[in-house]
Amino acid sequence: PNIELTKLQSETLKIPQITSTLNSDESSEEMIVLKTLLEKAKFDFKIDGLVHGGISSEFQKRSFEKICKESNLNTIAPLWKINSKEYMNSLLNSNFKFILTSVSSDGLDETWLGKIISMDDVSLLNKLSSKYGFNLNFEGGEAETFVTDCPLYLHPIKINKSQTVWDGYRGRFEIEDASLDSNAR
């Protein structure tokens, strides 16, 4: 959910965003579109590599490496195989503020949706992860996150209007309106 809000993240990071619409769930189609976008970024912005946030998905890592090799681009995966709890704690220690925008695992209920995650929450999530078997950093899709603020942002993202959708097992926090909070810094 909330993929359209990456535009605000791009804006506050002062990094250009290149997007495409994909009407398929086929990973082969995704890879073709990704390669096209990387080629465009290479040409338009003179990039020489891709930094991705993959932590444990071998498929994701191999896919990025293959596309980048074909496009003569470097790949960097600084979070690769990082310990989940260490990763979550490092985000908070580095002043990242993020919320959960979807949950779809036992142990994660609607109270997590839209919640700004704290150190206490990471401790609780770690316990729930052990009990219910989900990945603490949500690498398996058990939850999705959205960064509302971090040291690289010029302005935090303010959520003005949202709605929670819950079906009894999984849910989404749909951000209906958001803006850059230019008064916050």
List the predicted regions and their residue ranges.
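Nucleotide-activated chemistry modules centered on ATP-dependent adenylation/adenylyltransferase
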Residues: 1-185
